[in-house]
Amino acid sequence: MSVHINAEKGQIADTVLLPGDPLRAKFIAETYLENVECYNEVRGMYGFTGTYNGKKVSVQGTGMGVPSISIYVNELIQSYDVQNLIRVGSCGAIRNDVKVRDVILAMTSSTDSQMNRVAFGSVDYAPCADFELLNKAYQEAQKNNLPVAVGSVFTADQFYNEDSQIEKLARYGVLGVEMETTALYTLAAKYGKKALSILTVSDHVLTGEETTAEERQTTFHDMIKLALHTVS
């Protein structure tokens, strides 16, 4: 067991999907997996293990933001030797060529978090996705006629931020804004593990367009199926 996860060794699979919302973790496990077992309820941050197409897969809620996901990724790797970590979450689009309901494969991530400045000092470390997972996800999307955008995302340290650089980031090719990918990719690199963020565009920062609950659910289904096909 670790501080925030009370699973026994062997209860967590080598591959873990990481939604931010613990209730979304519960939904994923109950909807997509078979032979489901709940291994964690500490602080209400649910974790489940089941099988998908015969492959053992876990789903662990992470909470929101760099500090929260860092806790769970550290513990999953250090205490349970997880090898593959796939974030499945939402983001806000910041470019006109990225539409609401699109799915983004995050190739790399920039951030205003101080996480890597603390670790690397004056060096601007650029964390990126594992190429094998990224390529597999892209190929699966192509095979299933699922449109995806591949590129950079921005991991914001604040959800409400009046002093943002959104327009400049968009000019530099950043596709969307979220709150966790930089931490995931950095920690995966630190420990020699594989990581990928697959994101559903739930709203558009520039136009104000948002998805309805029903539309989010449909696109969310595409994202989860893509993640599961990538690792199965």
Swiss-Prot record:
Source organism superkingdom: Bacteria
InterPro entries attached to this UniProt entry: DeoD-type, Nucleoside_phosphorylase_CS, Nucleoside_phosphorylase_d, Nucleoside_phosphorylase_sf
Annotated site residues (Important for catalytic activity) in this chain: R216
UniProt-annotated binding residues for a purine D-ribonucleoside: H4, E162, E178, M179, E180, S202, D203
Keyword Glycosyltransferase: yes
Catalytic activity, reaction form: a purine D-ribonucleoside + phosphate = a purine nucleobase + alpha-D-ribose 1-phosphate; a purine 2'-deoxy-D-ribonucleoside + phosphate = a purine nucleobase + 2-deoxy-alpha-D-ribose 1-phosphate
Recorded GO CC terms: cytosol
Residues the entry annotates as binding phosphate: G20, R24, R43, R87, V88, G89, S90
Active site: D203
Gene Ontology terms, MF aspect: purine-nucleoside phosphorylase activity
GO biological processes: purine nucleoside catabolic process
Pfam families in UniProt: PNP_UDP_1 (PF01048)
Key words of the record: Glycosyltransferase, Transferase
Entry's EC annotation: 2.4.2.1
Cross-referenced HAMAP family: Pur_nucleosid_phosp
General function of this protein: Catalyzes the reversible phosphorolytic breakdown of the N-glycosidic bond in the beta-(deoxy)ribonucleoside molecules, with the formation of the corresponding free purine bases and pentose-1-phosphate.
Entry similarity comment: Belongs to the PNP/UDP phosphorylase family.
PANTHER family documented for this protein: FI09636P-RELATED (PTHR43691:SF11), URIDINE PHOSPHORYLASE (PTHR43691)
Subunit text: Homohexamer; trimer of homodimers.
Designated name of the protein: Purine nucleoside phosphorylase DeoD-type
Gene name of the encoded protein: deoD
